[in-house]
Regions:
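N-terminal, positively charged/glycine-rich alpha-helical extensions of SAM-dependent methyltransferases
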Residues: 20-42
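Conserved alpha-helix/loop element of class I SAM-dependent methyltransferases that forms part
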Residues: 52-72
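Class I SAM-dependent methyltransferase SAM/SAH-binding core
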Residues: 74-78, 82-132
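A short acidic, Gly/Pro-enriched loop at the edge of an enzyme's catalytic core
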Residues: 131-142
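A short SAM/SAH-binding and catalytic strip from SAM-dependent methyltransferases
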Residues: 142-154
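A short glycine-rich, Lys/Arg-flanked "PGG" loop and its adjoining helix->strand segment in the class I
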Residues: 156-168
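Conserved class I S-adenosyl-L-methionine
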Residues: 173-197
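Short alpha-helix
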Residues: 200-217
């Protein structure tokens, strides 16, 4: 698999998106290391083989829980990679979705898939570091991220950035794992394939996320630990939902 055929086009799109959305932060392509085309290809192949059943149910739950079906505006998937969740969200919402990922080598594949499904006009991509998001304050109507936050070196800073970018009244849904509507049989099969590498202390993670919210002064938040019937032996993951308060309405009559 080669992702570089349309990379020039993708970079131009990234730069255009960046020019529209921010002016004070510069884009820099990552230098070598783990953010490579080879890494992107490996993740895409792994996702196809293992995680493909996860995204449809997750998108379905997100749209239902946050009433996104008729909502318009901007949605951001932070750390979206190949953008499979965005494709599923495009099928169910009217939002324009932005794939914000630190590895731009995903973007050619992402655009190809979006165009294949008829959503090329409803998506954008931009290289983004969670610790310094390239968006204006109060920019996004919804921010989601699956399977990324545990890689962030400074989680307090990253979650603070997400909060900054949310519009007043908007919500973020950040986590790892599955949605409660994913059949237990499928979840069990995925965990069995993943083995020990996806074992983590959910209780410890919940405490960590709660501490981050308190440090940032975010009061309107909720930690979800999906536990559908029959899933007692399956780790369904953990999700953090938090809201940015709406702007206060000034009573000019007073």
């Amino acid at each position: 698999m080669r992702l570089s055929l349309r990379f020039g086009f993708v970079v131009l799109t990234i730069l255009f998106c960046g020019a529209c959305n921010f002016s004070s932060k510069s884009l820099q392509l990552p230098s070598g290391g783990k953010f490579t085309e080879e890494k992107a290809v490996a993740v895409i192949k792994g996702s196809r083989a293992m995680l493909a059943p996860v995204y449809g149910p997750l998108a379905e739950q997100i749209v239902e829980d946050f009433d996104l079906e008729e909502k318009t505006g901007i949605g951001i998937d932070l750390g979206s990679g190949q953008g499979t969740l965005i494709i599923e969200l495009c099928k169910r919402t009217q939002l324009h979705w932005i794939n914000a990922d630190i590895n731009p080598h995903y973007f050619a594949y992402f655009y190809e898939q979006a165009e294949k499904h008829g959503f090329g006009h409803r998506v954008s991509a931009i290289m983004a570091d969670a610790h310094s998001l390239p968006f204006h304050d109060d920019y996004a109507d919804f921010i989601v991220s699956r399977g990324s936050f545990h890689f962030w070196k400074d989680k307090v800073r990253a979650f603070g950035e997400i909060y900054r970018v949310l519009k007043p009244g908007a919500v973020a849904y950040i986590g790892r794992g599955f949605s409660a509507n994913l059949p237990v049989e499928i979840a069990s099969q995925i965990r069995a394939k993943q083995g020990k590498k996806m074992k983590y202390d959910v209780e410890k993670t919940a405490n960590e996320l709660s501490s981050i919210m308190k440090e940032l002064g975010i009061k309107d938040y909720c930690i979800h630990r999906p536990k559908p019937p029959g899933s007692e032996e399956v780790n369904y993951g953990i999700w953090l939902e938090f809201h940015k308060p709406p702007d206060k309405v000034v009573d000019k009559g007073r």
